[in-house]
């Protein structure tokens, strides 16, 4: 089996926040790293989502042409994701030629199958701005929940998909003007109504989907699918290859999911790999998507309808890992509202691994979760710095001071070591099971339990006391503990990869040893006497109360 993994495409309109990271890219990366470690063939694809009104609005605010703005943002985002250790096999752009080509191709296939129709619609025209206002160019009050900053394409508060004309008290996002009038314009529609039965049949077969994902898909289907407009009166986007529509582009939610395929094509072209084997005639491919819940309607309904309507054997997703929202002191993390902590800011505060661990430990899997600075402090200090970092520091420093920079000889493992081995084996298998099942909070809890096991062992065995009476027994305890460090490095690798590399280097592991699976690493006798090691710098810096108070004041955490 080969594993295709995609995470929801981060939008180009600004640096993403912690909620974006934990709701798609981070869990996808952890899953990809774990599967690679297990020896599986993995392809992890992502790209920036660059079309639509938010990109144009952000470019206007930045005083740049939209193409220049998107190019700069792409490189900024790509660099930040690299610093966070996101291991994309390819990170592309929906503005790339491959995506233009494939988007137009899918449209033409749908048109051939009579799933596209022209319609004349009424849409807002801003008299003061002298232009049509599609999607997010209109802001107003949501008719469903009353949220006053709802956008013309979707309410970010209740996730309802909207049209601009549904908004109460609509206004131009550009100028704030309420001098709007309805004018007619011809557009192209995807006949979701004609594809409804096929989509429902496909959704009904997805028995492994989570309650969150399945319920959102069924809610849409039960409300009845309506034809969806897939063109916009914009300049920036994929041009519509139809006479009479030369001044229109495709709706961002039509071309964006095609970006998964087009980015794979770009990867294949660059690396001389067969990209089509991942997307066509791909019975041996298991495809998993990662995204937050506001993206689920498009990925469970509109994108599958596009594939089904093409009447071609494109790969359909096998499992969608949907996430709820990460909230920040009473409100959802939001790029458009600039609420919360953004990824560039986060890296100035703490290391990438601190954030990776804390976020995935609190991933909003079954319900919304809340970020607090106190929780961040607790998990960095107690779980990372104490349970892992302090264990490594105590063992390697003690070994260096008493035995030198090689593992000492002597002693034979006894009942305590046998019991420790059984416990570690059980925890490693639980960890692997949870990662296979995409249960990230449980996986992180199990990893922390594995770290605690080592601390409990040395508290009982107390090598610094034992050394005074039995140096051979102490040597055996030390070797066991250093093998625990090796196990911690490998089992932690999907979660905190930068720390893992520091541990690999400290233990001077060979290339083969660094590629061990968690199961292979469970043997607590593998590193034998005579092996060299180094004492690394402290792995984690603790966060004190003064810094927490400062961060709460700076980022509105009250």
Swiss-Prot record:
<dbReference type="InterPro" id="IPR041872">
    <property type="entry name" value="Anticodon_Met"/>
</dbReference>
<dbReference type="GO" id="GO:0005829">
    <property type="term" value="C:cytosol"/>
</dbReference>
<keyword id="KW-0547">Nucleotide-binding</keyword>
<dbReference type="InterPro" id="IPR014758">
    <property type="entry name" value="Met-tRNA_synth"/>
</dbReference>
<feature type="binding site">
    <location>
        <position position="145"/>
    </location>
    <ligand>
        <name>Zn(2+)</name>
    </ligand>
</feature>
<feature type="binding site">
    <location>
        <position position="142"/>
    </location>
    <ligand>
        <name>Zn(2+)</name>
    </ligand>
</feature>
<dbReference type="InterPro" id="IPR015413">
    <property type="entry name" value="Methionyl/Leucyl_tRNA_Synth"/>
</dbReference>
<dbReference type="GO" id="GO:0004825">
    <property type="term" value="F:methionine-tRNA ligase activity"/>
</dbReference>
<dbReference type="GO" id="GO:0005524">
    <property type="term" value="F:ATP binding"/>
</dbReference>
<protein>
    <recommendedName>
        <fullName>Methionine--tRNA ligase 1</fullName>
        <ecNumber>6.1.1.10</ecNumber>
    </recommendedName>
</protein>
<feature type="short sequence motif" description="'HIGH' region">
    <location>
        <begin position="10"/>
        <end position="20"/>
    </location>
</feature>
<feature type="binding site">
    <location>
        <position position="158"/>
    </location>
    <ligand>
        <name>Zn(2+)</name>
    </ligand>
</feature>
<feature type="short sequence motif" description="'KMSKS' region">
    <location>
        <begin position="332"/>
        <end position="336"/>
    </location>
</feature>
<keyword id="KW-0614">Plasmid</keyword>
<feature type="binding site">
    <location>
        <position position="155"/>
    </location>
    <ligand>
        <name>Zn(2+)</name>
    </ligand>
</feature>
<dbReference type="Pfam" id="PF19303">
    <property type="entry name" value="Anticodon_3"/>
</dbReference>
<keyword id="KW-0067">ATP-binding</keyword>
<dbReference type="GO" id="GO:0006431">
    <property type="term" value="P:methionyl-tRNA aminoacylation"/>
</dbReference>
<keyword id="KW-0862">Zinc</keyword>
<dbReference type="GO" id="GO:0017101">
    <property type="term" value="C:aminoacyl-tRNA synthetase multienzyme complex"/>
</dbReference>
<dbReference type="GO" id="GO:0046872">
    <property type="term" value="F:metal ion binding"/>
</dbReference>
<feature type="binding site">
    <location>
        <position position="335"/>
    </location>
    <ligand>
        <name>ATP</name>
    </ligand>
</feature>
<dbReference type="InterPro" id="IPR009080">
    <property type="entry name" value="tRNAsynth_Ia_anticodon-bd"/>
</dbReference>
<dbReference type="InterPro" id="IPR029038">
    <property type="entry name" value="MetRS_Zn"/>
</dbReference>
<comment type="function">
    <text>Is required not only for elongation of protein synthesis but also for the initiation of all mRNA translation through initiator tRNA(fMet) aminoacylation.</text>
</comment>
<dbReference type="InterPro" id="IPR033911">
    <property type="entry name" value="MetRS_core"/>
</dbReference>
<keyword id="KW-0963">Cytoplasm</keyword>
<dbReference type="InterPro" id="IPR014729">
    <property type="entry name" value="Rossmann-like_a/b/a_fold"/>
</dbReference>
<comment type="similarity">
    <text>Belongs to the class-I aminoacyl-tRNA synthetase family. MetG type 1 subfamily.</text>
</comment>
<keyword id="KW-0436">Ligase</keyword>
<dbReference type="Pfam" id="PF09334">
    <property type="entry name" value="tRNA-synt_1g"/>
</dbReference>
<comment type="subunit">
    <text>Monomer.</text>
</comment>
<keyword id="KW-0479">Metal-binding</keyword>
<dbReference type="InterPro" id="IPR023458">
    <property type="entry name" value="Met-tRNA_ligase_1"/>
</dbReference>
<keyword id="KW-0030">Aminoacyl-tRNA synthetase</keyword>
<keyword id="KW-0648">Protein biosynthesis</keyword>
